[in-house]
Amino acid sequence: DMLDKVLVALEDEIDPLVVERGFVKDSDHSYYKKEYEQLKKFYDADKNSCSGFSYKIDSINQDFELWFRIDIDKDLAAGFCTFNVKENKLLISDVNTQLAIRSKFPKIPSGFCINDTWVYYELLPENDDSRALNFKRYNDLYYSLYDDEKFKEFINNCKATITRVMDICK
């Protein structure tokens, strides 16, 4: 199916990028295992599953890690989240942790605490809500992916956005 095709292609494209930057793919936490199960059920879910791939960038303190993430909701997003090691879940941390993130990664745009999960994110493929892929209510972009050339172009545009977002933590 198209979701699997997109995810496999994105993972193939970003794996070398994360290795090059020293990010570590998460597969140790029960969160990851739960997410993988959610990914398999994405289309059948009545609600958004918010699944995806997570890569550890760095520890912020003993309780929190900064993760790079490709997230699948109704659309695709790439960005940074904090992971609470003790609670085994993604969440925005306390003010001191947010200040530590800002200090350690000054390229993260100001006003970076977007919502309860994200530190910063951009929509894929081009951080434009009007051109975002929609896996829940199939839009024109979704249907265009069945054309091989348009699929390649989509993956390349996603890769460019992902690279730009990853470079914030260089």
What does each model-identified segment do?
Residues 1-137:
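Polyanion-binding interface signature
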Residues 123-169:
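Mid-to-C-terminal oligomerization/interaction "stalk" domains of large proteins
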